[in-house]
A protein has these predicted regions:
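N-terminal export/targeting leaders of redox proteins
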Residues: 1-12, 49, 53, 186
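Sequence/structural segment immediately N-terminal to covalent heme-attachment motifs in c-type
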Residues: 4-29, 99-123
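The feature marks the first
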Residues: 14-53
């Protein structure tokens, strides 16, 4: 996000606001955060609020989230977050490169415990704040699963649904995480 410098009463358009996000959130190799194009606007807004209020990004051991939380200091207000979230939600998802290898059949069995929140086809459910999984790159899904399992995400006392994720996969091995990621990527 970028803040307008100066006293201009005019807000920049949504695309211009989003441009500063692309330093990390594009498929160019820079900081290489997740590509956000096509993610649901409600989920983007929810996550932006978590970064802004400290539910995410306070642990320097989770470098990517720590950097994201620092960038949120430049966001003016909730309206700016809403505008960016709506803009992202209207972008078409980008094609992604498959990078993770695993056992798809084993992953399907593991995924059966994810269906209640993320849906049989990975479509997600807003009522339990579970995002669709189909637009995210496999390396990022695996990274986030590891962060949940290792307590680097979803542990804030106010992050109820994040804590559900932590508990759901706490005992999963790295092979489990890779296999379920490969299955999700096949949906």
């Amino acid at each position: 996000f970028s803040r307008d410098d100066g006293d201009s009463p005019f807000l920049r358009d949504d695309k211009t606001l989003y441009q500063s996000c692309l330093l990390c959130h594009s498929n160019k190799e820079m900081q290489r955060g997740p590509v956000l194009d096509g993610m649901e606007s409600w989920y983007i807004l929810d996550q932006l609020k978590k970064f802004k209020n400290g539910q995410r990004g306070r642990d320097p051991k989770n470098r990517a989230e720590f950097l994201m939380a620092a960038s949120m200091a430049r966001v003016r207000d909730d309206h700016e977050m809403l505008r960016v979230a709506d803009y992202i939600g209207n972008l078409k998802p980008k094609d992604s490169i498959t990078t993770i290898k695993g056992d798809i059949d084993r992953g399907k069995k593991l995924y059966s415990s994810c269906i209640g929140c993320h849906g049989a086809k990975g479509e997600g459910r807003q009522d339990v704040k579970a995002p669709a999984l189909l637009v995210q790159e496999d390396w990022f899904l695996l990274d986030q699963l590891r962060k949940y399992r290792n307590g680097l995400r979803g542990t804030h006392p106010e992050d109820i649904f994040g804590r559900v994720m932590v508990e759901s996969i706490r005992d999963w091995s790295d092979k489990d995480l890779k296999d379920v990621t490969v299955y999700i990527n096949s949906l």
